[in-house]
């Protein structure tokens, strides 16, 4: 099926009767063919002919109703001429600017530039066309970044030809030839951010619909299909599997987990999946984003239904009976996206400890009076998906927590969180699958057990089989623990490519080279990040201005820092607390530009604890004196009282390095690293604390703003 409704060369367009063109446009049921729409098409055709009258004999093409593949967007008109791609949005019969629609147009342009293969190197000129408006000739806003996207130009039918002429005579024209057939049928490679992806998955899209169509996207699809195949196999054979999925930051592990969870949400009870995460901010943001999206879709469906009801009384009754209830929506979503503590607490109910030490086990408390519905002892879900499973608690941390919180389990044995969670799924009499999504080098807090604990725990369950990529053996501790354990190695369970930074597949490697101080490696990778701008500055105002200028209207930007960066406060950068509440996290990620608590204000600074597993488009990464460059290696500090203290404990040092790994890989489109000048009058912010780090980044070759 063609992605457009009508296309022709410019020569053919001028020689074709407008009624013939409209006939093509009305043939498809996908578009409205009401009289008002036909009138709008006529006005668009006439305006387009006015714009191109001086180019009617040139090579070029036009296309109407171009559908952006898999993005649910449709562009009114495309013009390819003299190496320039014009993207036109018409507001026929209107004279008022509508900012929301303008943002949507710029989002379409950004999508084309980033995901549409044939548009990568083509200058794109977006035009907001109001044919009947009385507007002066628009100023042509030339591209200000290396993306080659002109600023939005607002035109009427009387000014469009002059604006087109200015663009076509600019220095950006005639540098590349646009072949109509190649462009119209170009591969499309979208990579949604995690919130957008979750929304689409919950709305019954498949992972193929929201992922890139190139080899890197196929990697994600293969992993998803491999997991689905294992689930079906476990069910068919009445077996129990532990499946481990590994991957670099941003490779799509969360996307795989959400895909599996949403795939089974409407199926019978025996196939239900639950998505779990110990990352509270991630859960809060996903739950709220999905709830808002579901509410909006429900309202749209209700309005459509009400429009079809003519009787006023019947309409009132129907509206009352089908009122959109946000509480109910949130409740449904929380059934399949849950924080780990909530799920764990549910299955700590009604159990008793039998035996002691290594002989300890759990049994059902036959005297327990369960007040809920259904079975409390056996998990409702046959498939459990633990995102960021490397952050599960070690034995002492888990046992201590349970003993304090659950009075009936004061004798809870020293079982790690992985061991207890697997034991819960082991209560199923038939089959079960536990899926661990593991981020390499992303354990960031005290008490987190790491990948090795899952290997150690599964040894206690002889009736379970383990599936994992051979990549897990790169960790020496894991390899040692896995010795003697039969693991079914499936390399499709490893995701090796960063999809978050869609213009920089080597970003993870670049960040790793920085943190490991492999300077020559970092220098070698940096030129490969030409489509992912990285800058450095010592001026916070410049840093904020840079992300604002680069960000498109629909893109999110914000400030990030390490949680140990406690002396950024004098720079008016306030770190969000590690245990942030919903009122802090949700506005930061989902609030719009009118919300002072949103990321856009760059006053509240998110740390690794808020952003791990999530992402923004552009980031100001504030680099404090907690992590200082020296020729001997990174010097690591934490702020205690009124001074910086050396971090000597290896575990804490690793957490801090991973914190910087997280914040340096959160931005999908680009970032600027802000290194303060310091203040020699403040003993906690001396210039010498910062200068070596700044010079290190300059040495690598990162450009200054």
Model segments located where?
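Conserved helicase/translocase motor-coupling segment
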Residues: 257, 444-448, 470-625, 629
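Accessory nucleic-acid engagement/destabilization modules that flank
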Residues: 1-190
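Conserved lysine of the Walker
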Residues: 253
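N-terminal pre-P-loop "Q-motif" helix
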Residues: 194, 199-202, 209-241
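Hydrophobic anchor at the beta1->P-loop junction of P-loop NTPases
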Residues: 245
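Signature of the SF2 helicase/ATPase Hel1-core->accessory helical subdomain module
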Residues: 385-481
